[in-house]
Every structure is written in structure tokens, then in C-alpha cells.
Curated annotation (Swiss-Prot):
One of its GO terms (molecular function) is serine-type exopeptidase activity. Belongs to the peptidase S28 family. The active site is at S174 (charge relay system), D450 (charge relay system). This is Serine protease vicPa. Keywords: Glycoprotein, Hydrolase, Protease, Serine protease, Signal, Virulence. It comes from Bipolaris victoriae (strain FI3). PANTHER family: PROTEASE S28 PRO-X CARBOXYPEPTIDASE-RELATED, SERINE PEPTIDASE. Pfam families: Peptidase_S28. The lineage of its organism: Eukaryota, Fungi, Dikarya, Ascomycota, Pezizomycotina. Glycans are attached at N65, N126, N297, N416, N436. Serine protease, part of the gene cluster that mediates the biosynthesis of the secondary metabolite victorin, the molecular basis for Victoria blight of oats. Within the pathway, vicPa and vicPb are probably involved in the processing of the vicA1 and vicA2 precursors. The pathway starts with the processing of the precursor vicA1 by several endopeptidases including kexin proteases as well as the cluster-specific S28 family peptidases vicPa and vicPb to produce 7 identical copies of the hexapeptide Gly-Leu-Lys-Leu-Ala-Phe.
Length: 534
């Protein structure tokens, strides 16, 4: 009976011209699966400028894993590593990460596509300001949509993996999760469903809210100590004598920095490490810092008990000792630039010197320059000190102008091209919807204590409060964790992460089934219309 129905459908297609994309998904494969291509890679000729074909193309690298693929018409699990070279993120093809785990559940293939200007996917031979003009949000989104619509995947000789014939599920984390959300908003109906973990969808210039989840989740003794330390630093740098300022800089090994805002920024930087902590970690620099400030022997401080009144001078001395012995040594030298060589060199923290080699490093391997371009141009999200009405663990000497000054030095005007032309956080949020995203078949997850949560749909700073979950846009807030914890299978040791992953995978599985149902309905309706016409 099944064979008869299949032959009947194919005959209808051949005789009556039934569109190829209305064939049901779960029919037997017409072309056998090529088992020699369980994994591999390819090169896609991508448009440099999607609005001007004359600019040409570049080779965009992609990788695939068909270990769990059910054959032609089965789901495609799509992933991009965003601001990283793909060769450093190939584990996302496997079931040690969420994309591979979803593929295993729904019998899908994982396809990983490298982001333009990262890794091997380079439109030009250097990263000059003029060459970077094609690195824009709309070009990036168009890349992935164009890939999905036109790629010939080498493991599917039948062509049944086109998004109109198979459900493409885009899974993203962090920046790539924002791309997931923005694609669903701006170019819908190409990908069938979306999973966005830790998506920072609302752009802000003075992103002081970044550190709020850190303050809520970190050991509270450490929080109050850091708040007191940063308050003291700001007080000295804003109103202290020249001798007091120099003495404080020297205490932290930063006497070679000329600018006070650079020094204050350097002293604030270690708290950013909070966002890197995963539930499966057995050691974290952030807790090492907290242990040092509190003069604790433990290397893994997770307590939240509030202790006695802060002894500022003791905490300041402990922080200075940790900063100069554990954090600072080798920090600049590790960059590899000769003008930043030396174990105790601190010049990489100087953002105002246009002569630094890093500011003129146009090599395509310089991922920092590419990401700086995107931050300076589109996303902003500069981590700054909190308003004076709030306690802060990040210096108030660091504001958006501090970052803009650096952007101007890194990207001078060239061939009438400059950074951030007519782009503001308001204009980006108007385009994308910001944290007021309402979509279809898109699932958001965020960690309760993820600093990036403050720019997400689950932000407590969102005017209407954290967005509520709906059937078409489920939102999961994972208790007690930081950034993108649900992307890694090793984090399933945490009960809340495990439950979030299971819920998310179950939702994606239902949406995959919905795709088959919708396609079957389309075929039935089309066939009925044909018979009625005859």
C-alpha cells in the first residue's frame, strides 16, 4: 500500500506538475544515503555584497556530520560559530553539544557554516577599513539565508534537503543566537524553527546592566568587597591627589598606564570572567579572585553567605596581590605583539596610543579586529559602570565614550568608508525589535545569572519585565547558571540545565513533526484541487 501511494504521488508530480517542494517529508529515500560521507566539509561560493552581484564572491567554508541523518528529507540542524574560526568549534557537529544532540533525537544532519571574515571564509586578503565595509548585519544574515536556499549538500544527492522540503533548525548560542533571532524576525520562512541560547538581542551603548546578574549570582561577600574596591578606585582617580593616584596605580602594577580610565578599566576587567563559568567546571578564575580577596584557602568558593562588614584596606590589599601575581603577568605578552612583550608589560591596556601594532594588524587571522568592527558598528553593548544610584563592580570612569575613542583609532576613515556611519543602538533595535522580539517557532533560553541576560528577552531591565513564554515562542530561564550552559552535554550534571535541554529538545522535535504535518496538508490540498478540477 505504501509503495502504491508513493508511486501515485510521483506520477501526479510527473504528469500534473505538482511542485517538488510539496512532497511529504517521510517518504522513503529516492536516492540511497552515501555512507562514505558521514562527515566532511565543503566550500560555498558566497556573495560578497548581496545588493550588488558585481562585487563578486568568496569561498565560505562549511562542515557537516551525517552520523544520525535519516536520509533525504530528514532535518538539517544548522549552526554557525559566529565570531570564531570554525576549525575551533567543530565539536558543535557532535553529540557532545546541543546541535549534535538534537540531530541524534530527530535523525538530522548537522551543518556548520563559518561566518564571513572569520577563519577561512575571507572575502579579501586583509582587514582594512575599506574591506570591512561588507561586514554588516544585513550581509551576515543574507549569507546564511542564501546558503540554506541554494547550497547543494554533498551528502544529499536527491536535493530533498532544501528548506522547502526538509525542516532546517537553526541553533545558536551567544552572538550566533542573536543572529538566530534576527533572522527569524527579518527574513522569516526559510528556517523552520529556531533555538537561541543566551541571545543578546537588545543593543545598548552604556551597557552597565551587564554586571547586574554577576552581582546577584556571585558570592555576596566577594560582591560587597569588589563594590567597595571599585568605589575606592573611582574616588581616588576622580578626586585624589596626584600622589594618591600614582600610589594606587603602582599598587596594582599599572604605573606605566598614562590614562586613569585605562587603569580603572584594567582593574574592572577580571569580573567579566563570571560569564565564562560553566556548571561542569572544576576551577574558575573568577572564584580564584574571590577567594584571594577574602583570603580564603578554598579554590572553589560558591557560598552566598554575607559575612562581616567589609574591611576595605584588607580587601584592597588582597585584590592587589592577586591582580599583580596571578592576573596581570603575561596578560599583554600573550598577544604576541613585540611592543607588548615582557612578563609585566601592561601596554595592551592602553587604548589611546594609535601606534600599537595591534591597531594596525590587518591580517585576516586577527579575529579581535573583526569583532571590534562589529561591536563598534552594530552591537555596541559596551560594559560600563553603573549609575551613581546603584552599587557597581565596574568603574564609572569607563563609559561609552571610552570605547568610541578606541573605535576611531582602530578604524580610521579610508576610501570614504568609516565605522558606525549613521548607526545607533536605537536604529538597530528599531530594525530588529530589540528585546521585544515576538516570533514563530523560536525558543529562547537564558541563564539566571548570565550577564548577557540583561540584553535578552528575559532581562529584568526590559520595560515590561522579562518576556513571558508562549507556545510559539517558549522562553526558558535556567536557574543558577551563566552563559549558554544548555549548549554543552557535560553540563547535564546540573539538574536545571538537564531539564532545560530536555524541554528544548522535546519542543524542537514537536516542531519537526509539525513540518511534516504541514507539508502533508499542503500535498493533500493540492491533490484535492487537482482531482476536483478533473
Amino acid at each position: 500500500m505504501l509503495c502504491y501511494l508513493l508511486i501515485h504521488i510521483l506520477c501526479l508530480q510527473a504528469v500534473l506538475g505538482v511542485p517538488y517542494d510539496v512532497l511529504p517529508l517521510r517518504i522513503p529515500a529516492l536516492v540511497p544515503k552515501d555512507t562514505s560521507l558521514l562527515s566532511g566539509r565543503g566550500a560555498f561560493q558566497q556573495l560578497i555584497d548581496h545588493t550588488n552581484l558585481d562585487v563578486g564572491t568568496f569561498s565560505q567554508s562549511y562542515w557537516f556530520n551525517t552520523t544520525y541523518w535519516g536520509g533525504p528529507g530528514s532535518p538539517i540542524i544548522f549552526y554557525t560559530p559566529g565570531q570564531h574560526a570554525a576549525t575551533d568549534r567543530l565539536h558543535y557537529l557532535t553529540d557532545t553539544t546541543l546541535p549534535g544532540l538534537v540531530a541524534k533525537e530527530v535523525r538530522g544532519a548537522v551543518v556548520l557554516v563559518e561566518h564571513r571574515y572569520f577563519g577561512e571564509s575571507q572575502p579579501f586578503s586583509n582587514l582594512s577599513t575599506a574591506n570591512l565595509q561588507y561586514l554588516t548585519l544585513d550581509q551576515v544574515l543574507a549569507d546564511f539565508v542564501h546558503f540554506a536556499r541554494t547550497v547543494d549538500l554533498p551528502f544529499d544527492l536527491s536535493g530533498q534537503s532544501h528548506p522547502s522540503r526538509a525542516p532546517w533548525i537553526w541553533i545558536g548560542n551567544s552572538y550566533s543566537a542573536a543572529l538566530v533571532a534576527w533572522t527569524e524576525k527579518l527574513i522569516p520562512n526559510v528556517f523552520w524553527a529556531y533555538y537561541a541560547s543566551g541571545a543578546m538581542v537588545n543593543c545598548m551603548q552604556d551597557f552597565w546592566q551587564f554586571n547586574y546578574p554577576t552581582q546577584q549570582g556571585m558570592p555576596q561577600d566577594c560582591r560587597y568587597s569588589l563594590e567597595a574596591i571599585i568605589s575606592h578606585v573611582d574616588s581616588v582617580f576622580l578626586s585624589g591627589s596626584p600622589e594618591q593616584k600614582h600610589r594606587l596605580k603602582t599598587r596594582f602594577g599599572l604605573q606605566d598606564l598614562d590614562r586613569l580610565d585605562d587603569t580603572a578599566s584594567a582593574l574592572s576587567r577580571p569580573v567579566i570572567a563570571w560569564t565564562l563559568i560553566q556548571p561542569s567546571d572544576t576551577h574558575a578564575q573568577f572564584f580564584e579572585m574571590c577567594d584571594a580577596i577574602g583570603n580564603l584557602n578554598s579554590s572553589w568558593s560558591r557560598g552566598h553567605k554575607v559575612g562581616s562588614e567589609i574591611n576595605l584596606q584588607k580587601a584592597l590589599g588582597n585584590y592587589a596581590n592577586w591582580f599583580t601575581t596571578s592576573y596581570l603577568p603575561g596578560l599583554c605578552e600573550s598577544s604576541g605583539y613585540s611592543d607588548w612583550a615582557g612578563r609585566n608589560n601592561v601596554q595592551c591596556l592602553d587604548t589611546a596610543n594609535p601606534s600599537w601594532q595591534a591597531f594596525h594588524d590587518l591580517a585576516v587571522q586577527n579575529e579581535d579586529r573583526v569583532w571590534d568592527w562589529m561591536i563598534c558598528n552594530f552591537f555596541l553593548l559596551w560594559q560600563t559602570g553603573a549609575p551613581v544610584s546603584r552599587p557597581t563592580i565596574f568603574s564609572r570612569l569607563v563609559d561609552s565614550m571610552y570605547y568610541k575613542r578606541r573605535c576611531k583609532l582602530i578604524f580610521p576613515e579610508e576610501e570614504n568608508v568609516t565605522y558606525a556611519a549613521r548607526v545607533t543602538d536605537d536604529s538597530i533595535n528599531t530594525l530588529t525589535g530589540g528585546w521585544n522580539h515576538t516570533g514563530k517557532r523560536i525558543l529562547f533560553t537564558n541563564g539566571e545569572f548570565d550577564p548577557w541576560r540583561s540584553a535578552s528577552v528575559s532581562s529584568v531591565f526590559r520595560p515590561d519585565g522579562p518576556m513571558q513564554s508562549t507556545s510559539q515562542q517558549p522562553i526558558i530561564l535556567i536557574k543558577g547558571v551563566q552563559h549558554q550552559a544548555d549548549m554543552y552535554v557535560r553540563n547535564r550534571i546540573n539538574k536545571d540545565v538537564r531539564e532545560a535541554m530536555d524541554t528544548g529538545i522535546a519542543q524542537i522535535s514537536r516542531w519537526v513533526l509539525d513540518f511534516h504535518v504541514e507539508k502533508s496538508k499542503t500535498l493533500t490540498q493540492y491533490t484535492s484541487q487537482v482531482y476536483c478540477a478533473h
